[in-house]
């Protein structure tokens, strides 16, 4: 196995990733597979922060008849459910894990405190950041970019159900072209589906590379961290 390319990483997992092939709820076997890869990262000496989405439970935009702010807060609570599920999965493997939330709920998690989060990472604890930024109208992608900047992560590992960034939906178009490398500006100008524009701009301003890859292949998280050429790398230099 190659040596780690990064010392501190931010892993962004969509809620759908935790649902596996089900598309809704939890696939505990698949969540365990993700947790086993995270454990290997910790064993390699890599400090791991994670942000989880909530799309396997609730998608704010799907509640089109609801008040947007209320729908977004419901989505934030969904991320907390996912964070606790991932924490439990990791702790069953013996990985020390902390959940920090942007909305205080001290009975189940710590409030987000930057210095405490960084201290946990230095002590080889995985830190899962839940409830997004704590504000409506901001996605969990933006939360991942924000927390990555705050904890001074070397990279955002954007784990998706697609193995990289394409010029169009590869599930719909057989001639979809995959990119190996992109600049932030190209992503923004072409409207490519990586992160939303707020998150992408935040990464660009803070020079945080984004590695987009699929979870469909075993050990892809390990491959991403050890520098194997998988997925699509988005950075300031193409």
UniProtKB/Swiss-Prot annotation:
One of its GO terms (cellular component) is cytoplasm. It is found in: Cytoplasm. The keyword Cell cycle does not apply. It is an enzyme of class 2 (transferase). GO terms for molecular function: ATP binding; UMP kinase activity. Pathway: Pyrimidine metabolism; CTP biosynthesis via de novo pathway; UDP from UMP (UMPK route): step 1/1. Keywords: Allosteric enzyme, ATP-binding, Cytoplasm, Kinase, Nucleotide-binding, Pyrimidine biosynthesis, Transferase. UMP binds at residues 54, 72, 133-140. CDD domains: AAK_UMPK-PyrH-Ec. One of its GO terms (biological process) is UDP biosynthetic process. InterPro entries: AceGlu_kinase-like_sf, Asp/Glu/Uridylate_kinase, Uridylate_kinase, Uridylate_kinase_bac. The keyword 4Fe-4S does not apply. ATP binds at residues 12-15, 55, 59, 166, 169. It catalyses: UMP + ATP = UDP + ADP. Coiled coil: none annotated. Its EC number is 2.7.4.22. Residues 20-25 are annotated as: Involved in allosteric activation by GTP. Allosterically activated by GTP. Inhibited by UTP. Homohexamer. Catalyzes the reversible phosphorylation of UMP to UDP. Belongs to the UMP kinase family. This is Uridylate kinase. The lineage of its organism: Bacteria, Bacillati, Bacillota, Clostridia, Eubacteriales.
């Amino acid at each position: 196995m190659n040596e780690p390319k990064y010392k501190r990483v931010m892993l962004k997992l969509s809620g759908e990733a935790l649902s596996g092939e089900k598309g809704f709820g939890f696939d505990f076997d698949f969540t365990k597979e993700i947790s086993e890869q995270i454990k290997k990262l910790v064993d390699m000496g890599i400090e791991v922060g994670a942000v989880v989405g909530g799309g396997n439970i609730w998608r704010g935009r799907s509640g089109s008849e609801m008040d947007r702010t209320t729908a977004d807060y419901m989505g934030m609570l969904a991320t907390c459910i996912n964070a606790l599920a991932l924490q439990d999965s990791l702790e069953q493997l013996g990985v020390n894990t902390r959940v920090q939330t942007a909305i205080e709920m001290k009975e189940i998690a710590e409030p987000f405190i930057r210095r405490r989060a960084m201290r946990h990472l230095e002590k080889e604890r995985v830190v899962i950041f839940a409830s997004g930024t704590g504000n409506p109208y901001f996605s969990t992608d933006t939360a991942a970019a924000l927390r990555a900047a705050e904890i001074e992560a070397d990279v955002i590992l954007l784990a998706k159900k697609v193995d990289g960034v394409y010029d169009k939906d590869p599930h719909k178009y057989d001639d979809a072209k995959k990119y190996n490398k992109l600049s932030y500006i190209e992503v923004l100008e072409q409207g490519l589906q990586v992160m939303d524009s707020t998150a992408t701009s935040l990464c660009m301003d803070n020079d945080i590379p984004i590695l987009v890859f699929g979870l469909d292949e075993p050990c892809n998280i390990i491959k991403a961290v050890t520098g194997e050429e998988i997925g699509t790398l988005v950075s300031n230099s193409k």
